[in-house]
Swiss-Prot record:
<dbReference type="InterPro" id="IPR019489">
    <property type="entry name" value="Clp_ATPase_C"/>
</dbReference>
<dbReference type="GO" id="GO:0005737">
    <property type="term" value="C:cytoplasm"/>
</dbReference>
<dbReference type="InterPro" id="IPR050130">
    <property type="entry name" value="ClpA_ClpB"/>
</dbReference>
<feature type="domain" description="Clp R">
    <location>
        <begin position="3"/>
        <end position="147"/>
    </location>
</feature>
<feature type="region of interest" description="C-terminal">
    <location>
        <begin position="765"/>
        <end position="858"/>
    </location>
</feature>
<feature type="region of interest" description="NBD2">
    <location>
        <begin position="554"/>
        <end position="764"/>
    </location>
</feature>
<dbReference type="InterPro" id="IPR003959">
    <property type="entry name" value="ATPase_AAA_core"/>
</dbReference>
<dbReference type="InterPro" id="IPR001270">
    <property type="entry name" value="ClpA/B"/>
</dbReference>
<dbReference type="InterPro" id="IPR004176">
    <property type="entry name" value="Clp_R_dom"/>
</dbReference>
<dbReference type="Pfam" id="PF10431">
    <property type="entry name" value="ClpB_D2-small"/>
</dbReference>
<comment type="similarity">
    <text>Belongs to the ClpA/ClpB family.</text>
</comment>
<dbReference type="Pfam" id="PF17871">
    <property type="entry name" value="AAA_lid_9"/>
</dbReference>
<dbReference type="InterPro" id="IPR036628">
    <property type="entry name" value="Clp_N_dom_sf"/>
</dbReference>
<dbReference type="Pfam" id="PF00004">
    <property type="entry name" value="AAA"/>
</dbReference>
<dbReference type="GO" id="GO:0016887">
    <property type="term" value="F:ATP hydrolysis activity"/>
</dbReference>
<protein>
    <recommendedName>
        <fullName>Chaperone protein ClpB</fullName>
    </recommendedName>
</protein>
<dbReference type="GO" id="GO:0034605">
    <property type="term" value="P:cellular response to heat"/>
</dbReference>
Length: 858
């Protein structure tokens, strides 16, 4: 007997039998140990053979263990050596003989198993008693191997290769485990056309991630199952290749190729009845490639070209270009089928189709408004991913969140139970006191506790009743799903009696029961319907945009936009109106959707509220004053500095880092972008801005397109400021607009100015404006001090004093901030540090003669 002629798995079984003998303190390896080792082997071959011959593996294991326990134990200090018995060697010799007679070059585990049925051993008797004899086993092995010979050391890996390294998609369709596919008829038809060709009948689905490439294959599998395909594909099966399983554990050179050849061999033998589906097709290129070895794609090429292999691939546009197109020989064997992103309305249809599957899985209900919101809001707010994937994810996560809430205690009941615990703790502490006040308190708390416990009991009963009703509805839905699968099977098998019973009897009855179970009062403790607000809440967490801005309440907010902006921006009513009108046009959907929400050029002297209006705009639209990307254009005075905005070109330092502008917008697509002091930048920078203002997008140095459609572009400039400063106090700003525009046209090109929504002039501030700004600044200081529990008060005299001293038409409101720091904040800081003002004090600011006084009231 030559041990080198045993396969790796056979050697492993022999080694394992030695371990079993040593573990049981047996001196010899007997056929019984070999049988015990075979029953525990990992490939599943022996289990399949036992099942095919009518045996029971668990029964065999118990009987073998019983016999092993009967063998005398020999305990040797330090562990004795285990020898092979003559019987075990005879079994292995017999296995070699059977393998040779069968034309095998190597002895496999099933041949050792077959050899155990010969001879008069305990192991042989156990097998015979369980109905497994040499004749039956030889027939089972022949059927299992399908005529294959053991020619390599890893021969077991090539048995039933498709089952090991593939997933039968058609079988999943048959068992109803696939989601229904809505639409995509054109892509499925084109795929069927390519598959029906004589040569090069291999379609490759190319599309962006998440557009539904794999779903098309599932749709095709469902059509094959329901016989809704041409006759040539009627009996086909779609097997998805598991590249991970194919590569995993392939330790030796040639083992991976051997596995793949076994898969391809089975497909070839099926005479066109098996269609191989390879998801992430680009993984074929380079897989299994080692020194001198061929990669997977080269093994496939001959069969692909001859039409012996029906193969469907799926990959993204980028990976197809990067891997497949580079290998022209591989690319020509596949016929591209381009899969585009569905529209929002198509996505709504898709979501309605798969709604029931998600309701069944999560045990919740999904409203139609939630489906519409998922499609429209994801399309608008999640710009870096594709429909329908991003919309399905929103529905899935909203359902998951609802499911978690349903399984936990309702908030109202939880608060009630916490209050009961709190009262019980109070009562325990008060019982130790003997005074009259404590006794009254005990009486009062005891009464409250009784009421709360009664309320809690009723609420718990109501909660449990609602919960059991939901569980009942869920069981009925599962029953309905099974009935529908049975109906499909009955219709396919032409079992009309069963089909009519299911269609007109069982299914309507279950549906009636579901309607009764779901007729729950909406005012109950448990909310089981996923609504539009739940979807908006999920998007809010992803993007950081407040929920209110996504739902219908936004309409009311937009109508009072001017009023809200005037609360923080004083004296610039024309500017506020211009900005508000542009934002309303965009939000109402009557502006070009491929442009930013608004683009403005703010012109005016320093300190009049240009930047403040930008912050107020961010606060109003995104509920965050810091939702601003501020780019100081004085940093981009040189031509080469422009590349910092979109990223350094290939070959330059910083290429991998991305651009200041593009990366910030990619990470946070909803913000106000402020280009400050824009006239100081190099003129070439406006060429980049043309694309943003016109198309609402910009391509960075790495070829990634960044979406600016949900941003507001604000450019500020001091051009023509001297004209606006020298204007009379109450003169209309637009009288001098033409003069200011002469300065603007001298710096900016007409094509740039034409793309802006509004050019807004900010006039200089008058004394009344300054008075209002003083009030806002002091209110802001009041809030800061309130955090330290110090109350700040001020009267009209203080406001007038600061307004008079802080008014400078040339510098706007900026001197006012410095004045408040000098006159108030500096003195307050000294008093706080000296301990004159402490927590709980009230401080009043008032004018005395020609200066401000800070008084501590208490």
């Amino acid at each position: 007997m030559n041990i080198d002629k045993f396969t790796a798995h056979a050697k492993s079984v022999i080694a394992s039998s030695q371990s079993i003998a040593a573990k049981n303190d047996h001196q010899q390896i007997l056929p019984l140990h070999l049988l015990s080792s075979l029953l525990s082997e990992e490939t599943g071959i022996i289990q399949t053979l036992i099942n095919n011959t009518g045996g029971n593996i668990n029964l065999l294991k118990d009987q073998v263990q019983l016999e092993l326990n009967k063998i005398p134990k020999v305990q040797v200090e330090g562990g004795g050596q285990v020898y092979s018995s003559a019987e075990a060697l005879k079994v292995l010799e017999k296995a070699s003989s059977i393998a040779k007679d069968s034309g095998d070059s190597f002895v496999t585990i099933e041949r050792i198993f077959e050899a155990l049925t010969y001879g008069n051993t305990i192991a042989g008797k156990i097998l015979t008693n369980n109905g497994i004899n040499s004749k039956k086993l030889a027939a089972a092995i022949l059927q299992f191997r399908k005529g294959k010979k053991a020619d390599t050391e890893s021969a077991e890996n090539s048995y039933d290769a498709l089952k090991k390294y593939g997933r039968d998609v058609t079988e999943l369709a048959e068992s109803g485990k696939l989601d229904p596919i809505i639409g995509r008829d054109e892509e499925i038809r084109r795929t069927v056309q390519v598959l029906s060709r004589r040569m090069k009948n291999n379609p490759v689905l190319i599309g962006e991630p998440g557009v539904g490439k794999t779903a098309i294959i599932e749709g095709l599998a469902q059509r094959i199952f329901s016989k809704d395909v041409p006759e040539s594909l009627m009996n086909c099966r779609i097997i998805e290749l598991d590249m991970g399983a194919l590569i995993a554990g392939a330790k030796y050179r040639g083992e991976f190729e051997e596995r793949l050849k076994a898969v391809l061999g089975e497909i070839k033998e099926s005479s066109g009845e098996i269609i191989l589906f390879i998801d992430e097709l680009h993984l074929l290129v380079g897989t299994g490639k080692t020194d001198g070895a061929m990669d997977a794609s080269n093994l496939l090429k001959p069969m692909l070209a001859r039409g012996e292999l029906h193969c469907i691939g799926a990959t993204t546009l980028d990976e197809y270009r990067k891997y497949i197109e580079k290998d022209a020989a591989l690319a020509r064997r596949f016929q591209p089928v381009y899969v585009s992103e569905p529209t929002a309305s198509d996505t709504i249809s898709i979501l309605r189709g798969i709604k029931e599957k998600y309701e069944l899985h999560h045990a919740v209900r999904i409203s139609d408004s939630a489906i519409v919101a998922a499609a429209t809001l994801s399309n608008r707010y999640i710009t870096d991913r594709y429909l329908p994937d991003k919309a399905i994810d929103l529905i899935d996560e909203a359902c998951s969140r609802m499911k978690i809430e349903l399984s936990s205690k309702p908030e109202e009941l939880d608060e009630l139970d916490r209050r009961i615990i709190q009262i019980k703790i109070e009562l325990a502490a008060l019982k130790k006191e003997n005074d009259e006040h404590s006794k009254k308190k005990i009486t009062h708390l005891t009464e409250e506790l009784e009421k709360l416990e009664s309320k809690s009991y009723d609420m718990k009963a109501k909660w449990q009743a609602e919960k059991s009703k939901l569980q009942q509805a869920q069981k009925l839905k599962e029953e309905l799903e099974r009935a529908r699968i049975d109906l499909e099977r009955a219709e396919r098998d032409a079992n009309l009696a069963k089909a009519s019973e299911l269609k007109y009897g069982i299914i309507p009855e279950i549906m009636k029961k579901i309607q009764e179970a779901e007729s729950m009062d909406n005012k109950g403790l448990l909310k089981e319907i996923v609504s539009e607000s739940d979807i908006a809440s999920i998007i809010s967490r992803i993007t950081g945009i407040p929920i209110d801005t996504m739902l219908s309440s936004e309409r009311e907010r937009l109508l009072v936009m001017e009023q809200k902006l005037r609360e923080s921006v004083i004296g610039q009513d024309e500017a506020i109106k211009g900005v508000s009108d542009a934002v309303r046009r965009s939000r109402a959907g009557i502006q070009d959707i491929n442009r930013p929400l608004g683009s403005f050029l703010f012109l005016g002297p320093t300190g009049v509220g240009k930047t403040e209006l930008t912050k107020a705009l961010a606060s109003f639209l995104f509920d965050d004053r810091n939702a601003i990307l501020r780019i100081d254009m004085s940093e981009y005075m040189e031509k080469h500095a422009i590349s910092r905005l979109i990223g350094a070109p290939p070959g330059y330092i910083g290429y991998d880092q991305g651009g200041v502008l593009t990366e910030a917008v990619r990470r946070r697509p909803y913000q106000v972008i402020l280009f400050d002091e824009v006239e100081k930048a190099h003129p070439d920078i406006f060429n980049i801005m043309l694309q943003i203002l016109d198309e609402g997008r910009l391509t960075d140095s790495q070829g990634i397109t960044v979406d600016f459609k949900n941003t507001i572009i604000v450019l500020t400039s001091n051009l023509g400021a001297e004209i606006l400063v020298n204007q009379k106090e109450d003169e209309d700003t637009y009288k001098v607009k033409d003069e200011v525009m002469e300065y603007v046209k001298a710096v900016f090109k007409p094509e740039f100015l034409n793309r802006l929504d509004e050019i807004i002039l900010f006039h200089r501030l008058n004394r009344n404006n300054i008075h209002d700004i003083v009030k806002i600044q002091l209110e802001s200081l009041k809030k800061i001090l309130l955090a330290q529990n110090i109350l700040l008060e001020f009267d009209e005299s203080a406001l007038n004093y600061l307004a008079e001293k802080g008014y400078d038409p040339s510098f706007g409101a900026r001197p006012l901030k410095r004045l408040i720091q000098r006159e108030i904040q500096n003195n307050l800081a000294k008093m706080i540090l000296a301990g004159e003002i402490s927590s709980g004090n009230t401080v009043k600011i008032a004018r005395e003669k020609e200066e401000l006084r800070i008084k501590i009231i208490d």
